[in-house]
Amino acid sequence: MSHCKFEQPRHGSLGFLPRKRASRQRGKVKAFPKDDASKPVHLTAFLGYKAGMTHIVRDLDRPGSKMHKREILEAVTIIETPPMVVVGVVGYVETPRGLRSLTTVWAEHLSEEVKRRFYKNWFKSKKKAFTKYAKKYAESTQSINRELERIKKYCSVVRVLAHTQIRKTPLAQKKAHLMEIQVNGGSVADKVEWAREHFEKTVDIKSTFEQNEMIDVIGVTRGKGNEGTTARWGTKRLPRKTHRGLRKVACIGAWHPANVQWTVARAGNAGYMHRTQLNSKIYRIGAGDDAKNASTDFDATEKRITPMGGFVRYGVVENDFVMLNGATPGPVKRVLTLRKSLLTHTSRKALEPVSLKWIDTASKFGHGRFQTPAEAKQFLGTLKKDVA
């Protein structure tokens, strides 16, 4: 005989409160990997734009698994990563209250796409940003060198200011994304010199990450607007004959205390939350100028990573890209922060070398039949539109 349960686990986690929209669209890096002076100087993060998803076929190399040495099909995410431009360096001093910035040194010339980041309305502005700062370089570089020496003398953490080249992507936005990226490896002086040498120069994705590396993806999830308690918290639907709605919380608390507790599931905003996704594996780092960046040893067809017709609602990937295992936060066109992992990975899954056998490049708009335009033309023959 069935009976009522008087105790049950609560619905939804309280660890993600407040469930409100993120303050900014770019993912914030709240912790960087631990520095190791024995390694060469390198960046610990990179910015990219989510282009879309596809799927791949590969042989699983995992002894003991039932799928060992057998083909598996996996979903992958393509993130376009044009080279980033270094435009500044920031020095941080360790204090009893944590890290505090000592000074910031900017490059002499900044492109228009990064200057737009400092204006709400670029069209109506006077566009005077960094004009006085550029005069320091014109008059004398002594003050610039003095600030760099202060960073070498007093700082323990060095981070560079780098921005994306958003004009190279299919996005309509003209305002580049700017962020601080920690520089690890070598001494503090080596880091400052590395930053100074790379002022106004580009840094590509291959100098930061490598294939088969486990990384973290930081971004803002897809926004879903206002949702009720059932969709937002996963509460149970009430019985069919319930008065005034089923997808609600029947009891929102006791008479006293005479207010609704913060732990009670309520309707409100869902999605557009800042999230950090750990342990995404890099399956491939492709070059934008390679006509065979989607070919493999088993599939020698000359094809690019962009599917036929382009990625839906994104377009054509013409720059360097990163192929990550599984899904990532956010919709297409969302800027994502790729960060080196904070952990030392020892699991077989993390250390497994990945060798791709086939990458799907069929159209993602509907059920794609062909992998390349040449394959479609060979099958369909000469069409009427080709003759006219």
Swiss-Prot record:
Which Gene Ontology BP terms does the record give? cytoplasmic translation; translation
The UniProt entry, under InterPro entries, shows: L3_arc_euk, Ribosomal_L3_dom_3_arc_sf, Ribosomal_uL3, Ribosomal_uL3_CS, Transl_B-barrel_sf
Task: List the biased-composition ranges (Basic residues).
Answer: 18-31
Please state where this protein is localized.
Cytoplasm
Which is an annotated Pfam family here?
Answer: Ribosomal_L3
- What does the record give as the function of this protein? Component of the ribosome, a large ribonucleoprotein complex responsible for the synthesis of proteins in the cell. The small ribosomal subunit (SSU) binds messenger RNAs (mRNAs) and translates the encoded message by selecting cognate aminoacyl-transfer RNA (tRNA) molecules. The large subunit (LSU) contains the ribosomal catalytic site termed the peptidyl transferase center (PTC), which catalyzes the formation of peptide bonds, thereby polymerizing the amino acids delivered by tRNAs into a polypeptide chain.
Q: What family is reported?
A: Belongs to the universal ribosomal protein uL3 family.
Q: By what name is this protein known?
A: Large ribosomal subunit protein uL3B
Task: Give the organism the record lists.
Answer: Schizosaccharomyces pombe (strain 972 / ATCC 24843)
